[in-house]
Amino acid sequence: TIYRSLFSLARQNPHLIRRACAGALGFGVLSMVFTSMTFVLGSAPYYFSDFEIGLFGLLGVIGIYSSSWSGKTVGQGKENLVAKLCIGLMLFSCVPLYFAQHSLIIYAIGVLMSYFGLTAFHVLNQNLVYRIDGKARSRINAVYMTIYFTGAALGSLGAVYAWQHYQWVGCVVLGLIFSLGILMIDRFDFKRMQKN
């Protein structure tokens, strides 16, 4: 059946699972940022309306440019550079995000950093996993995206839990933990790729 073929593909390609897990953690970071955005902007000192929060969320349009940049740079054979820059952006976005309740501009910078990093990283991951087997592209995509969206769900759930128990600091720490996880998986995977 199709499900057996997907499980078989996943078992036979640990590289696919590593890239998918790294991508899932990245999507988890972004999901945490956007889930908690309502909490941050809807409370003191901003008290934004739902409409205003939605407008602020349009910062995500930067993803259009990050996708284009990532695709071109990966096409030049600079996958490792793209990975390092993307992970660096996601890691260091925690610094401006930490000050979200003190400055809207600094918060916006943090959101842009995390969104740019994740979107470009997603393009990189898809580029890498599609090289595994061009004939199995649809099945590879199914495995990758299933794990990828699981990360988003975990990020949203984690953000709600962190906010309820630890407020905004808890959300930022969660994002940092996810980002460190991305770093470890990504570096391990690149070492394995170099050996192979």
Where are each of the predicted segments found?
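Juxtamembrane intracellular "pre-TM" segments in multi-pass secondary transporters
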Residues: 1-20
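Conserved extracellular-gate-facing transmembrane-helix segments in secondary transporters
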Residues: 22-34, 42, 117-118
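Transmembrane alpha-helical cores of Major Facilitator Superfamily
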Residues: 24, 58-62, 112, 142-150, ...
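Loop-to-transmembrane helix entry
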Residues: 44-62, 139-143
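Helix-to-loop junctions at the C-terminal end of transmembrane segments
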Residues: 65-79, 163
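C-terminal transmembrane helical hairpin of 12-TM major facilitator-type secondary transporters
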Residues: 80-125
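A late C-terminal transmembrane helix in Major Facilitator Superfamily
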Residues: 130-168, 174-178
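Multi-pass alpha-helical transporter architecture, strongest
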Residues: 173-196
